[in-house]
Structure formats: C-alpha cells, structure tokens
Amino acid sequence: MFRGATQINLDSKGRLTVPTRYRAMLNEESQGQMVCTIDLHQPCLLLYTLSEWEIIEEKLSRLSSMNPAERRVQRLLLGHASECQMDSAGRLLLANTLRQHAGLVKEVMLVGQFNKFELWDEQAWYQQVKDDIAAEQSTQEPLSVRLQELSL
C-alpha cells in the first residue's frame, strides 16, 4: 500500500528517484517493473507496479471496442501506458510524452494512493490540494453512505 506525498526531482534525462522506503516493496512485488499512464480526469500520471497494472489491463480487455466511451478509455489508458524498470539506484525513466502530458519538468510530487502512485507537477499538486479543501468546505452535496460511515 502506498501513502503519503513526497517531493522529488526529475533529473535532466527525465528520471525520478523512488524514495528509499518504497524500493524494497517494489522490488519484492514486481522486481522493480512499473507501468505509467495518464490520469483521465486530472493533470497527473498514474504509476502502478506491473502486477497491479496487469489487473487493470484484464479489466480493460473486457471493455467493448465497439462502445465509443469504452474504446476511448482503452485508447487513452493503454495508448499512453509505458513500462519502466527501476534501476539499481532506484530511478525510473518516465517517457517524454507522459512528462509533457502532466507538465512534469523538475519538481514533482509522488503521491501514494493505495495501489498506485500519482505523479504531479509540484505547483499543480498544491493547487489541487487547495481546490479540494475549498470544495469540501463549500459543498452542499449530501455525503455518500460510504463517506458517512468513514470515521476519522
């Protein structure tokens, strides 16, 4: 399980260094093999272990290519999916097209989200957090049953 937000830097080749606390888990679970793709709703990237990505690919394979909405999701997620291997120094090379999509240049936030990481431009991340907090404080929408049952 991945959690927490960590500021990291991309090097001049577009590599990020995975924080030490995640490396053993990633090597154990997937031998450092990862898959990165775009997020369909936010200006960030999604980074999965290969084993977790294979579960998603299986779900995507059950969608119909004849249904326009399902085909779009397949095209966007699979079309942007890029395998990346963590090297011995704990670095992952992100494809240039993915970095451009999310506006990743230098300062990046690696955000744990249970079974995956999100990769954000640092400024975009802080703006998203600010926007999310404002939305929560001003919402008039009733809470879903699941949120009502969540006790913190």
UniProtKB/Swiss-Prot annotation:
Subcellular location: Cytoplasm, Nucleoid
Protein name: Transcriptional regulator MraZ
Protein's organism: Photorhabdus laumondii subsp. laumondii (strain DSM 15139 / CIP 105565 / TT01)
Domain SpoVT-AbrB as annotated: residue spans: 5-52, 81-124
Family matches, as InterPro entries: MraZ (IPR003444), MraZ_C (IPR035644), MraZ_dom (IPR020603), MraZ_N (IPR035642), MraZ_sf (IPR038619), SpoVT-AbrB_dom (IPR007159), SpoVT-AbrB_sf (IPR037914)
Record's GO cellular component terms: cytoplasm; nucleoid
One Pfam family it belongs to: MraZ
Alphabetized Gene3D superfamilies for the sequence: Transcriptional regulator MraZ domain
Subunit structure: Forms oligomers.
Main location: cytoplasm
Molecular-function GO term, any one: DNA-binding transcription factor activity
Family note: Belongs to the MraZ family.
Keywords for the protein's UniProt record, in alphabetical order: Cytoplasm, DNA-binding, Repeat, Repressor, Transcription, Transcription regulation
GO biological-process terms attached to the record: negative regulation of DNA-templated transcription initiation
Chain's role: Negatively regulates its own expression and that of the subsequent genes in the proximal part of the division and cell wall (dcw) gene cluster. Acts by binding directly to DNA. May also regulate the expression of genes outside the dcw cluster.
